[in-house]
């Protein structure tokens, strides 16, 4: 099972916090994620410019370099390569996967977001997919239609590579995506200060060891249940 944390440092710091404060909070949460054995961290800070994103990418590289946790950068292939990231996660409007493969080093991970079976064609050549939004999620407040378990199952059946579910995957829903054949799940809200995380130097950070342990246990148990 693969567990992927998708970042949003705005959830960790006080409203209107400076970039420096957000950086410090993300560094603290990253330490908890690595300690918990999170498999993959996706740096996704859509409101930041390339310069600030590069700073966070360098921090993540330093925090994960000697660990089993890998990290990828959302969309910005240039930032990912410059930081020595393990890979990039592409969106539908990102650089095509084939073009990206031409300029990345061997072993570089390329992930792709998909929202339907039809989109898997454009994702050919990816190492893994993130499929969603599966369930209602606070991270997508304006969305009214969801992929659902059957939509996730169809995407899993359509491709030969691992598929991670995203969107409202927590609690018993971990078992739902396991039974649909997903290789794991990705999440923002579950990992990024949304549950009244402890205040640590002004940051709402969450100690993740029990969260990750519970998710793995539930996924592995239900993945083998007929």
Regions found by a protein language model. Name each.
Residues 1-90, 94, 102-127, 154-163, ...:
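Conserved N-terminal beta1-alpha1 strand-loop-helix module at the mouth
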Residues 43, 109, 138, 142, ...:
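Residue-level signal for pocket-adjacent positions within structured domains
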Residues 90-98, 133-158:
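Flexible, gly/pro- and Lys/Arg-enriched active-site loops
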Residues 128, 132:
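Short beta-strand-loop elements within alpha/beta enzyme cores
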Residues 134, 166-169, 188:
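Short, loop-centered acidic/histidine patches that primarily coordinate divalent metals
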Residues 183-189:
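Acidic, Mg2+-coordinating phosphoryl-transfer loop and its flanking beta/alpha structural elements
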